[in-house]
Amino acid sequence: MSPTTRRLGRLFGLLAAASIVVTACGAASAPALTDPKEIVTAAVRTGQSAKSVHVDATLDGSIKADLSGTGAAGAAISLTGTTAAADIDLTAGNAHATFAVPALLGLSGEAIQIGDTTYFKTSLTGDKFQSQKGSDSLPVNPGDSKSVVDSINEALSQPGVDPVKGDDVACGSTQCYTVKIELTPSEINALDGGNPLASQLPVDLGSASLNLTIRVEKSTTRLAGIAATVAMGDQGSVTFDLTFSKWDEAVSISAPPADQVQTGS
């Protein structure tokens, strides 16, 4: 995987890390913030006691992927209408997610993470879950907020990463700050020291630009959403939107029954 791909993944990963340490806070409204970096880091700092969260995702656009490995982009693959939803138990480190990609042969699937075990099935693999042992699903310890804040601050201090406070917007029944980050292909490549390598992915991210908008509730400074557009020139573009809700509501996530898990995998 190229450094450019890793940097994009790291940026998204850090923002995702921020999302899982943000909590619903019942205290009085926070003072108004004007600095975009303070808005993002404030959202992280409110997350020291988060117990659970629900995430909804939508994905639209199309890409031309080199699925044959020949180096030539293939036909456009539509991602329009793709959706996903997840409940995350931050205390136990468990998660339950579902997804659907209607434009890709009606693909759908379900994943359950219990500790270091992942159970996964799709409409192409049959009715039973396959299980796999691995590392814990959550990329950070929700209680280690200082580490996450430091990582976010480091990411926001990189050359070319210049967050800008946008207009406040409605978020359901409340108001949200918006923080915008725009990165050109050259700025993304500069994050890798200007030495991008050939990507091992079927899509070359070396020419990708990124437009990112982070939504943070004004009254609680908790993360409300992340929207991003990744433009890849002739290879297409993808837009996704994540919304976060049901903070600290009761959630029960358990492994599937044994008779629903494929044996010998």
Predicted features, each with a name:
Residues 9-19:
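Sec-dependent signal peptide hydrophobic core
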Residues 2-5, 9-10, 25-265:
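Subset-of-secretome marker
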